[in-house]
């Protein structure tokens, strides 16, 4: 089975690879590993793999992985305002969907990026219509200070589980 990629180029390459596999009739599984991008994605540096990345207004938030470690960054390219390597990850499933979170700690602040999938309704054909949201939750001393949605849907890479230790789910 081909590996999953979050980039459009990766999806295109994956589809092309599946077409080629169908023509040949054999498949070779790929080893799961972090693949670095040749061009930086949002706030990820060259050689880092984006585990999460989205725009929030004029700024960006990203979690990037490299060599079994991950880093949270917030700001603008070339002007990062906050960096943290104190990260935890949580997942919670619920009827009709679930949520994945990565939380970065900095003193008494917690910055939680999340992606959530919910059942938004049923289509006329009986299909489940999924609603996807992603964003950033900011807490100080355990109290919500701000919540911001990403521009567009962003997902947390499944590869994050391999390098970010488990932590508590942050309700919001």
Give the positions of each predicted feature.
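Charged, amphipathic alpha-helical segments
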Residues: 55-62, 87, 105-125
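Short polybasic amphipathic segments
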Residues: 67-76, 129-140
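N-terminal secretory signal peptides that target proteins for export/translocation
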Residues: 1-7
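Short, surface-exposed coil-to-beta transition loops
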Residues: 57-58, 97-99, 131-133
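N-terminal secretory signal peptides
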Residues: 30-92, 101
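Bacterial Sec-dependent signal peptides at the C-terminal "C-region" and cleavage site
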Residues: 21-32
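Bacterial N-terminal signal peptides
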Residues: 12-22
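C-terminal partner/receptor-binding element of secreted or periplasmic proteins
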Residues: 132-133, 138-172
């Amino acid at each position: 089975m081909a590996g999953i990629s979050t980039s459009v180029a990766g999806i295109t390459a994956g589809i092309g690879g599946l077409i080629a596999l169908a023509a040949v009739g054999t498949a070779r599984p790929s080893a799961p590993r972090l693949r670095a991008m040749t061009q930086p994605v949002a706030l990820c540096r060259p050689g880092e793999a984006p585990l999460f990345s989205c725009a929030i207004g004029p700024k960006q938030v990203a979690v990037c992985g490299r060599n079994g470690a991950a880093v949270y960054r917030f700001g603008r390219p070339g002007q990062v305002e906050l960096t943290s390597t104190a990260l935890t990850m949580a997942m919670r499933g619920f009827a009709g969907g679930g949520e994945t979170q990565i939380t970065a700690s900095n003193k008494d602040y917690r910055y939680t990026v999340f992606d959530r999938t919910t059942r938004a309704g049923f289509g006329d054909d009986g299909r489940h219509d999924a609603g996807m949201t992603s964003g950033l939750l900011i807490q100080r001393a355990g109290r919500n200070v701000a919540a911001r949605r990403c521009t567009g849907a962003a997902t947390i890479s499944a590869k994050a589980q391999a390098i970010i230790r488990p932590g508590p789910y942050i309700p919001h």
